[in-house]
A protein has these predicted regions:
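Gly/Ser/Thr/Pro-rich low-complexity, intrinsically disordered segments
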Residues: 3-56, 62-460
Length: 460
């Protein structure tokens, strides 16, 4: 029966005939014997699971079932309320549950294993292929979830997404972010400051800098024709006063702060609150200095950003403050480095750059990432380009019984997937791949909130 957008299937209630548990070389197996087919559902959380089936179990069946701790199974308990039977288990946090059914006789099989990923290769929509598989690096198999998309297809488009259209500051779960922007598929994007929730890297949309690049880090750029470009990106910006004095701008709409000038436009939000103590904020409207505002203690004073202008947050830079009295006319200049990025209206920053022209070029130090970041093993997100120019978005999770990949292992995986160019995105607890309403690579309860992402959109 179809109810709204839901297909509702109703079966006659079944009966549980027996419950069996047996340790295996790869983990644990629980088998439920049924009198006839039954609908069943699985809910997973880190370290536990719940299987609910439409069918009763007699007290004698439940009392005779005494599951002992197994390889990955710590506890197992079954209850029945006369209409449904519920099986709850406590398992190793590294384990996952794979649910399957068998006929003749009717059975439900619950496998608890570290390598529970079911390989898939599905053409999900014209120009969109979903894969999940194990990819081995140095003998270690990593679970890899990927979506390959041909952006040259007229029904597909890619764009940056962030927490709210009215501000670039803030964090939210990727599922919420994707639903808010109505993206069919999404992956978490660039880095951000988890304390103040400000972006730390490039986001450009429709030729407008939502947030500027920092530290010469890697980025992906694209256009409406589906062309993709990867490289390390810097932004050279300066302002020139009416009397010829010139000052560099460090960053645009960014949580990355240092001595000098930070530029904040209306894209940042309605107001700017100083990030550091004792900033002097220069208010500019119609390319003319309107006033100076003392920022005071960081995080306290909200300063309005003119809709026809911007703010210059000066930090330990009295020379610039003195050269910008009210009434001063200002001209701004902007150029990307390399200039190849200039041709692309859409950009998302991340880093480090992993692969360029089929060669692993990973250099965390070049992009000013810490040594600890460069060597740690963690879940990862990445974006790449295949030899035939298709976009590939990828997440890689913990290997069975172990940790996630290092950056070097991630670069190797991207090459094995066929990428000629690839970029690391924010990872760890941020690493999330949203696909048609759910996360492919992890339980949503384990996914951290993020500042931004990449959304793939399908035209109706």
């Amino acid at each position: 029966e179809v109810i709204g957008n839901t297909l509702q299937i109703t079966l006659p209630p079944s009966q549980v005939l027996a419950l069996r548990h047996g340790p295996q070389t790869w983990g644990d197996r629980v088998v439920v014997d049924l009198a006839q087919p039954a609908t069943v559902s699985l809910q997973e959380q880190p370290g536990s699971f719940t299987v609910t089936l439409d069918g009763s179990a007699a007290p004698s069946v439940l009392s005779s079932f005494a599951a002992q701790p197994g390889v990955l199974l710590d506890q197992l308990h079954a209850t029945s309320n006369g209409q449904q039977t519920v099986i709850r288990g406590q398992i190793a946090r590294s384990a996952r549950v794979r649910l399957s059914t068998l006929p003749n006789p009717n059975r439900i099989v619950i496998d608890i294993r570290a390598d529970a990923l079911v390989p898939r290769d599905i053409l999900w929509a014209p120009g969109v292929r979903w894969r999940q598989q194990y990819v081995a690096v140095g003998g270690n198999p990593f679970p890899v979830y990927s979506v390959e998309a041909d952006l040259r297809q007229p029904n597909l488009s890619l764009r940056s997404i962030w927490t709210e259209p009215s501000t670039i500051s803030g964090i939210t779960p990727l599922i919420t972010l994707a639903n808010q922007w109505q993206a069919a598929i999404a992956i978490n994007g660039g880095f951000f400051n988890r304390n103040n929730r400000h972006p730390l890297g490039a986001i450009r949309h429709d030729n407008q800098w939502i947030s500027g690049p920092i530290l010469g880090r890697g980025a992906i750029a694209w256009n409406d024709a589906g062309d993709l470009y990867f490289g390390r990106l810097a932004l050279q910006q300066s302002l020139t006063t009416s009397n010829g004095q010139q000052f560099p701008i460090n960053a645009v709409n960014s949580g990355y702060v240092q001595a000098g000038i930070g530029l904040y436009t209306p894209t940042w939000g309605a107001t700017y609150t100083p990030i550091l103590d004792n900033e002097t904020v220069v208010v500019v409207a119609n390319d003319q200095v309107v006033k100076h505002q003392a920022g005071g203690t960081a995080g306290h004073l909200a300063i309005t950003i003119p809709q026809d202008g911007y703010l210059l947050a000066t930090r330990a830079y009295s020379t610039a403050v003195n050269a910008l009295p009210p009434g001063t006319q200002i001209e701004r200049t902007t150029a990307t480095v390399p200039d190849a990025f200039e041709a692309y209206p859409e950009i998302m920053g991340g880093g480090p750059l992993l692969v360029a022209n089929r060669t692993i070029v990973l250099s965390a130090q070049t992009e000013q990432f810490s040594q600890a970041f460069a060597t740690q093993s963690a879940p990862r997100s990445a974006v790449g380009k295949t030899a035939d120019g298709q976009l590939m978005i990828v997440t890689v999770h913990h290997r069975p019984g172990g940790s996630g990949p290092s950056l070097h292992q991630l670069a190797d995986i991207m090459v094995q997937l066929g990428c000629t160019d690839a970029l690391n995105l924010d990872g760890g607890s941020s690493s999330s791949l949203y696909f048609a309403g759910t996360l492919l690579n992890r339980d949503p309860q384990t996914a951290a909130r993020v500042n931004n992402g990449l959304g793939l959109f399908l035209a109706p």
